[in-house]
Amino acid sequence: MTSVEKSDSGECGTPFVVVNIDDVGMCHGANKAYLELRRLGAVDSGSVMVPCPWFPEIAEAGALKPDLNVGIHLTLTSEKRHYRWRPLTKATPASGLIDSDGFMWRSVAELRRNAHPDAVEAEMRAQIETFLAAGLIPSHVDGHMGGVFAPEFVDRYVALSLEFKLPTLFPATIEAYGPKHNLGAVDQDSYASAAERLLNAGEKLATKALETPWHRNQPALERYQDLYHQIEPGLNFLCLHANAAGEIEAIEPDSAQIRIDEYELLKDPSFLDWADSLSLRRGSLRDARATSR
């Protein structure tokens, strides 16, 4: 595996891979895992949930270390049972952004049924501006649980990405997006139109966005070797969810161990050696953009 500095990310036979950790900023364990994995060179970037309680911790680390490679994980839902967050925009019920308890909706389906696109755009803008105001240099922008790719909001996502000149995660087709199961029915025409707008602006679309394997039916090594074997030529974005043990067991009891397994595997020297033996190029979305223009 070679770094982006040693080769470009243009169209060729060798896949370009962004090993990305989602949900940074959600809790201390997410930050701890990302900081260690980034220090080890095991990952290329992390997607930060700005509305979450532990955003200030990762913001402080990123402001001190510009090469931390953190991006904006635009967050429009709050799915945990007891550990939840609210919009930065202090939205009212009329916005459709919040449930009866004042938190973001638990699912993308509820978000789509209730949220006004103008309110969604205002919230996404607030998250981007808060991230930038913290002194962070964005490696990219993407979306938590895929909410930004819903047909009601995808044009707003693209418009803000272009306005702020952010390297943008956008799969070439919605079928190439691993977490698409969160979305429900998607209007292919609106998605294709948004993709074309990004292409015309010079952005590179992802061939695949692969997600954490949310099961423990195999040993962790086999699960992640299977995941890596799904990588294809072109730009691949791995939406991983590594988390150190501690709070996550209470926050997300049903799948906490999957996140912990992922963290332990990604820092395991034998897995790192195996991954390094693959014919892949690595870097952030910002790296991919810089080397493909």
UniProtKB/Swiss-Prot annotation:
GO biological process: carbohydrate metabolic process
InterPro entries recorded: Glyco_hydro/deAcase_b/a-brl (IPR011330), YdjC-like (IPR006879)
Entry cofactors: Mg(2+)
Root EC class: hydrolase
E.C. code: 3.5.1.-
CDD domains: YdjC_TTHB029_like (cd10802)
Residues bound to Mg(2+): H73, H144
GO molecular function, one term: hydrolase activity
Keywords associated with the record: Carbohydrate metabolism, Hydrolase, Magnesium, Metal-binding
Pfam families assigned: YdjC (PF04794)
Gene3D superfamilies for this protein: Glycoside hydrolase/deacetylase
Family label: Belongs to the YdjC deacetylase family.
Function: Probably catalyzes the deacetylation of acetylated carbohydrates an important step in the degradation of oligosaccharides.
Official protein name in the record: Carbohydrate deacetylase
Species name: Rhizobium meliloti
Lineage: Bacteria, Pseudomonadati, Pseudomonadota, Alphaproteobacteria, Hyphomicrobiales
